[in-house]
Amino acid sequence: MVSKLSQLQTELLAALLESGLSKEALIQALGEPGPYLMVGEGPLDKGESCGGSRGDLTELPNGLGETRGSEDDTDDDGEDFAPPILKELENLSPEEAAHQKAVVESLLQEDPWRVAKMVKSYLQQHNIPQREVVDTTGLNQSHLSQHLNKGTPMKTQKRAALYTWYVRKQREVAQQFTHAGQGGLIEEPTGDELPTKKGRRNRFKWGPASQQILFQAYERQKNPSKEERETLVEECNRAECIQRGVSPSQAQGLGSNLVTEVRVYNWFANRRKEEAFRHKLAMDTYNGPPPGPGPGPALPAHSSPGLPTTTLSPSKVHGVRYGQSATSEAAEVPSSSGGPLVTVSAALHQVSPTGLEPSSLLSTEAKLVSATGGPLPPVSTLTALHSLEQTSPGLNQQPQNLIMASLPGVMTIGPGEPASLGPTFTNTGASTLVIGLASTQAQSVPVINSMGSSLTTLQPVQFSQPLHPSYQQPLMPPVQSHVAQSPFMATMAQLQSPHALYSHKPEVAQYTHTSLLPQTMLITDTNLSTLASLTPTKQVFTSDTEASSEPGLHEPPSPATTIHIPSQDPSNIQHLQPAHRLSTSPTVSSSSLVLYQSSDSNGHSHLLPSNHSVIETFISTQMASSSQ
């Protein structure tokens, strides 16, 4: 005996005294054995003897009162949970109720995890879903699943409800197989069958034994005949009976799990559909997306993978205009030298100024850019127009070889379009000029003019910005082709870098978002192979000239800067002058001259004078430039 009370015992005594119970009554109650010790069939814990609901345990016919002393049964809903299946035992005969109570009591005395595995095995053997257990016992679906699969602890009263259902289900199944065709109907009017009728009927579920037979038959014949299906029905029912431990002659006792010919037919139909779907999915995965037209090289890794490519004829390329929405098209461009075709991927989207770096000039990703008005987006890659078919009326006499390098803006002037450009530009020759214009400042466009297969000189042509929007209506899109790595391409990359030729000029502006490329290179030639051996022999960079005038006044051209280039032939020396500006807005212009000399000196017999020259049609009264 403990001579001193603990703190908990002291608090309990104080609570009893505060409830109105006198000390004499408390001592008398402790001295006399009260009826609270006689509840149920065994002694209970003294700590729970004061509960007011102990009298309810005497009404339970399964004798579960002795197990109510567990601590987990006094949780939140432990006192409120009353499984309906336990109340239904009162409707059974006394012998049947006593038998089920004895079996449930024995199961409660065993290890809960071992009994849970036994119940789970029984459910799998007879293809009984857990939903049926939940509908009958009132247990929580998640709690029941965790208890059967993981051994999660469950309160004694809930386990008693589960074990009661388990014992009753065993009796029902035994009666079904014993009375094959009618045993299941004998027990339906009884009270213990009422909860099962309220729930949904069990769905048919194929057992593992039947599935093994059907899959083996499917390998032999994917669409069996009616006779073959009936044979499979007998085999499946026999296997299900053997799985349940009963004779195959008692197949009618399977109840809702009985295999029929219709169910076998549906199973084969579903398997055929699944196989066809898997085959189609595998073929789609194997084939992948359809390849693009043309045997040209694949797009590099830096190409936009999200842009689909479609076939676009060269005649349709001329009609493409720059829009707000980004699209992508591919054009089949025939080579002017009769070589293989190359596929040009054209993306209609604006290019950031970072794409104007010299390192990206040789990129094979083409940008098809045009506009219906306003400033044009920059073009960051080399663009080839010489290989396009001359199907457009405005470009029916375009020179064959024309390469445009890093144009911040593109403007096309054709023989049939002088009216749209007004009197400022006239083109009476047989050629077409494609030039690049910046969006904020005037440009001095050096044009390399040639005749035959020789490259002669670089002619600066001066323009100013901004032009009137109507001047940009006939703009045509420059299309870039896949250009192979060559010395000429490397030379072009050097031309676009301001530090390559004009490294001694510290005032050269860097590439910025507001000021794009200061110059645009235009090369015309009939044979690109002669351009591969070009080497710069002399470079002259003239100082920038700035001029400003008020609106409405025409300012005369600034004094010309004469540049003499030594050459073997005096006729090769060009006298260059800046041309008239096209508008009176303040402009900043710069002109430069670079002479390229081919390794073959025999091909330099003539210079600018050319009947089909690009420059000849523009060096007119509107542009003051002379040649000697």
UniProtKB/Swiss-Prot annotation:
There is a cross-link at residue 117 (Glycyl lysine isopeptide (Lys-Gly) (interchain with G-Cter in ubiquitin)). The modification Phosphoserine is found at residues 70, 93, 247, 313. Disruption phenotype: Mice are born at less than half of the expected frequency. Neonates are slightly smaller than normal and do not grow normally. After 5 weeks mice weigh only 50 to 60% as much as their littermates. Mice develop non-insulin-dependent diabetes mellitus (NIDDM) 2 weeks after birth. Mice exhibit elevated levels of blood glucose, combined with reduced blood levels of insulin and insulin-like growth factor I (IGFI). Males and females are sterile. One of its GO terms (molecular function) is DNA binding. The keyword Phosphoprotein applies. Residues 1-32 form the HNF-p1 domain. Residues 87-182 form the POU-specific atypical domain. Residues 324-338, 560-575 have a biased composition (Polar residues). Keywords: Activator, DNA-binding, Homeobox, Isopeptide bond, Nucleus, Phosphoprotein, Transcription, Transcription regulation, Ubl conjugation. Gene3D superfamilies: Homeodomain-like, lambda repressor-like DNA-binding domains. GO terms for biological process: apoptotic nuclear changes; bile acid and bile salt transport; bile acid biosynthetic process; blastocyst development; bone resorption; cellular response to glucose stimulus; cellular response to L-leucine; cellular response to rapamycin. It comes from the Eukaryota. One of its GO terms (cellular component) is photoreceptor outer segment. A motif (Nuclear localization signal) lies at residues 197-205. Residues 199-279 bind DNA. PANTHER family: HEPATOCYTE NUCLEAR FACTOR 1, HEPATOCYTE NUCLEAR FACTOR 1-ALPHA. Belongs to the HNF1 homeobox family. Binds DNA as a dimer. Heterotetramer with PCBD1; formed by a dimer of dimers. Interacts with PCBD1. Interacts with BHLHE41. Interacts with NR5A2. Interacts with SPOP; this interaction promotes ubiquitination and degradation of HNF1A. Transcriptional activator that regulates the tissue specific expression of multiple genes, especially in pancreatic islet cells and in liver. Binds to the inverted palindrome 5'-GTTAATNATTAAC-3'. Activates the transcription of CYP1A2, CYP2E1 and CYP3A11. This is Hepatocyte nuclear factor 1-alpha.
